[in-house]
From Swiss-Prot:
This is Glutamyl aminopeptidase. It comes from Sus scrofa (Pig). It comes from the Eukaryota. Residues 36-942 are extracellular. Keywords: Aminopeptidase, Calcium, Cell membrane, Disulfide bond, Glycoprotein, Hydrolase, Membrane, Metal-binding, Metalloprotease, Protease, Signal-anchor, Transmembrane, Transmembrane helix, Zinc. Homodimer; disulfide-linked.
Amino acid sequence: MSTDSKRYCIKTKHVAIICAAVVAVGLIVGLSVGLTRSCDSKDGGQGTTQSPSHLPPTSSPPQDQGVCPASEDESGNWRDFRLPDFINPVHYDLQVKPLLEQDTYTGTVNISINVTSPTQHLWLHLRETRITQLPVLWRPSGEQVQVRRCFEYKKQEYVVVEAEEELAPNSGEGLYHLTMEFAGWLNGSLVGFYRTTYVEKGQIKSIAATDHEPTDARKSFPCFDEPNKKATYTISIIHPKEYKALSNMPVEKEESVDDIWTQTTFQKSVPMSTYLVCFAVHQFDSVTRTSRSGKPLTIYVQPEQKHTAEYAANITKSVFDYFEDYFAMEYSLPKLDKIAIPDFGTGAMENWGLITYRETNLLYDPNESASSNQQRVAAVVAHELVHQWFGNIVTMEWWEDLWLNEGFASFFEFLGVDHAEKEWQMRDQILLEDVLPVQEDDSLISSHPIVVTVSTPAEITSVFDGISYSKGASILRMLEDWITPEKFQKGCQEYLKKFEFKNAKTSDFWEALEEASNLPVKEVMDTWTNQMGYPVLNVEDMRIISQKRFLLDPNANSSEPHSVFGYTWNIPVRWTNDNESTITIYNRSETGGITLNSSNPNGNAFLKINPDHIGFYRVNYEVSTWEWIATNLSLNHKDFSTADRASLIDDAFALARAQLLNYKEALNLTKYLKMEDEYLPWQRVISAVTYIISMFEDDKELYPMIEKYFRDQVKPIADSLGWNDNGDHLTKLLRASVLGFACKMGDSNALNNASHLFEQWLTGTVSLPVNLRLLVYRYGMQNSGNETSWNYTLKQYQETSLAQEKEKLLYGLASVKNVALLSRYLDLLKDPNVIKSQDVFTVIRYISYNSYGKTMAWNWIQLNWEYLVNRYTLNDRNLGRIVTIAEPFNTELQLWQMESFFKRYPEAGAGEKPREQVLETVKNNIEWLKQNRDTIRDWFFN
């Protein structure tokens, strides 16, 4: 599926002042929000075609208390979070009937169960859906067992079935059979089985589909909802005749039930985990390709958007064929479908044989979409294809090893796209997308290991984060480099063969790679998966290196929380000298560091440690070496690879932020930028310096100096590329980045161009160049937006059908420098007919990027927290993560407000880690400003 150790005290006399200030701020915000709501909300979106949706249900489905009432009975092992290992499903016969207009569905499931120990109770997962008839239970002999009662144990999301007598273990081939009838809602949520709507030729149409990962299959139907409870499925859907049904497997038969209903039954599936079960009822059109091995690869899409599925269809075929070759294993099912869901909570979901997508990640229109959209589609398509092997064929034993799914998909997606789009430099772009961003996350005390214990649905949901995905991908990249790509590939093939249709743990993967490489993979890699963080290597005399844990907070206790490895790592250190590249294993037991066996014994030539940032660590050279690097970048930056230029700058700014390097040395590296003309370094430079920019945004003395310096640095490349949307893929990405940075730094020429194009667009007669649209919407709105242009942009958002264009317009709307309009925009978040459920948190984040909206967005979250929890639930990871919009905060008052808010709502659900991380970050920001402002001011001043 496409993430705090210091204590801060406020002196007592300041508390009264702060309290008064907070009350005043709260009143002002509350009044402004209230006033603008009463004035503006009535005309939000008048006179436009509304994108339909539906509101959450006002109440839960009525409970049949006589069937399976809720109970606090804790007399059995259903008290435990995990299912017992002596009750295992073997096969599900599942029939579901959606009543689309009523927003409900009914169903029946018959589960064949293997019982290996005597028990009087069977329990399985169920949440929000209700049992409508007393369950029926049969022995392996076919004799019915009397059921005494059933009840829901809501604490662990179970339904418990109690038999009149003890069930003996079944022997031989015979199995118990449990039949349950159930009913549930199709509205109010983007998880489980749900309905959403879209417009076709002015008519509102419905589609119903499932989204089950990680623990939401239990919302659709009663099931043993753990990844190691694999079973086969025969699924049938009863649906209106004018609709079609899809599921994991091909259709076995379609039968008419009556004049209104058709029953579609699908072939029996291979053994799979509950979270991969999928079905959909739709009226879409399709585009099909055929794989080299003869498998149909079909994309289902709204009929009016059929042309936007062509690119995804082509990339699917190319990457699918590549992975069948690379993994030396044919795809396991007879077909592979993909479907674009109009309102979808995650980026995409790898359901076996029926992958579901958010529209932005599947549908690409070359005449309307940007190059970044095209790359996103390719990456997400490749990511979900990887899962058809890593995740579906071989599934992690338990969610603590989620990275075996997500880290692998995040790594191999770059190989897949690199195969299909060879000019995009995807093998290097992994630095921008995964390696360098997650190194920032993982340098906090509040990070977590890749392999982490989880024991609630909220904890499971919360590990779908940058550590599982991006750090997982990063260490696989390092591992592949160490043991060689050939042996890495062979090890992956052996792992897939050995655990086909089964579950595996991290240690199983290490074992497969050890057999393929004859190298101590487990000994090295356990230090990377079983403890959080990563090292910084300090280089002395150009050959002596020592390691220590890298933390952004220089005052943090680097031994906390406890790690069995003591925050030391076994490191495959790659280094180059005179164009020769070598790997030396730095054993963590060598506490005094190691000496590299360099052909340069005097240490007077540059020894590049970690070329192309292939290893998941940072490198700190002596000051004289950093000065040499800065000089040589200015003399001939092409002596360093594009990845090295990005890596050196990122390392330097991270080291300076952690007070391991003077900011003077880091900033000196940026002096060469007037000559830089490549995407990779520029994109990373912009990210690296954004921290400084955001910290000093409100500093009236320093910020203009920062703006002027970076404006001058970016001007040559911005002027050279200009505002014509031409060039290859990477040039288009580069242009969007540097022109955006020029606008952000207040370049009058860039801002005037953005405003001019924006004014032309407002006339309705000009189509903007696709790769400049986001820039124009953002900075045109920021520079010259008013109520008229804002209303026009909102109208365009509501009338356009392409999701990628909608997303850009949402960002434009969030960029207006007008508090009343931003307040009105925040009000629209509660109207799903205007802003889809999937986009609410995106909009809040966009508003927070606006200097006018930063505090407004945060205050809106606080004022509307209970509403958001009711709408999305505490288990929603997007809700959990939204608190991270406060990461740029850097005052004691802002910190106090955050801590007060978290105390008021202590239940964080999937937001537990994000809360820890944002508090740690804000505390670090406050301290950072005290420590670094003068140094940075002096550098820019001079």
